[in-house]
């Protein structure tokens, strides 16, 4: 009976050994597999890879393609769609949760490019020169939580930003959105409408500030916390238009982790000044027709006042040193003043003596005799 009792355990061990002995799915051509194909695939094959590999195992969880020349992501590109854009039936990668497509020269993402990836939670399209983005490019991604588009929207212009608004609209479950390094001059309205967004990365853009409408859109109804905002390395203009942003930052510092790195790019008088160190009441508006000189006349903060105080202290110190020098040399100064007084007195006495000599009538010269008086003088013999 004992051997019979041990048979189930032995059978279980045999089943596990058989499962482990089965050959794993082969790694796709031009790709590297780490920990088995279903864990991580990395495909970095240069310009010869012009479309996603077709032989990715269906149980793959993570797929990375770097350095390829994909150029155009057509509809259902990862679900068996062919080069003509025809979609394949069904889902080829039902378990894929992370897809990284950085540095692949992708210029166009068509509608439905990621169809057939129902489990995809993280998508990274950073560092691709996108020029066109379909309004339905991200449709069919109900589980998407993270979307990275860093350094990918610079070349597209306003049309691409408008398409981005349409493409973001269906991503109701999105938590993280990366838009760093895209020369954005405003926040995408669709990004502000994502109800579950937890973090918005807009660093290294061209944001001169956030207007009151954008700040209101960052707040949630019902007291729910709004998304964190990464805002560093933007050319902020610290004029009167920055007052709402400054007030918002001081009330929600924890929502802007890099708030201490926010610095002014204009006006010139406040160049590289930390925004949080400014006094909102002192931020002035430049005249609409003012030039650079008008900009320099804007907002003088506490540091400028401190410089004036320091200058006054330096002048006071110089005056104190001057008084100390006078005090230490008081005897020499008194001697110099006495000598000067005596010299002046001697000079005045000399002037007075000469004046008296000139005024004495006895010392006046005799008047000259007339010319005709010599003929009748007593000794003339006439």
Swiss-Prot record:
| Keywords tagged on the record | Disulfide bond, Glycoprotein, Leucine-rich repeat, Membrane, Repeat, Signal, Transmembrane, Transmembrane helix
The highest taxon in the source lineage is Eukaryota
Q: Where is the composition biased (Low complexity)?
A: 365-382
Q: Which organism is it from?
A: Homo sapiens
Q: Which residues lie on this side of the membrane: Extracellular?
A: 27-307
* GO biological process: one example: negative regulation of canonical Wnt signaling pathway
Gene encoding the protein? TPBGL
Output the PANTHER family linked to this UniProt entry.
LP06937P, TROPHOBLAST GLYCOPROTEIN-LIKE
Glycosylation positions? 62
- Cite the repeat ranges for LRR: 57-80, 93-116, 117-140, 171-194, 196-217
Q: Where in the cell is it found?
A: Membrane
- Topological relation to the membrane, as annotated: Single-pass type I membrane protein
**Could you tell me which cysteines form disulfide bridges?**
27-33, 31-43, 238-264, 240-285
GO cellular component annotations of the record? plasma membrane
- TM stretches of this protein: 308-328
Cytoplasmic topological domain ranges are 329-382
Annotated region Disordered: the residues are 358-382
Where does the signal sequence lie?
1-26
InterPro entries linked: Cys-rich_flank_reg_C, Leu-rich_rpt, Leu-rich_rpt_typical-subtyp, LRR_dom_sf, Wnt_signaling_inhibitor
Which protein, by its recorded name, is this? Trophoblast glycoprotein-like
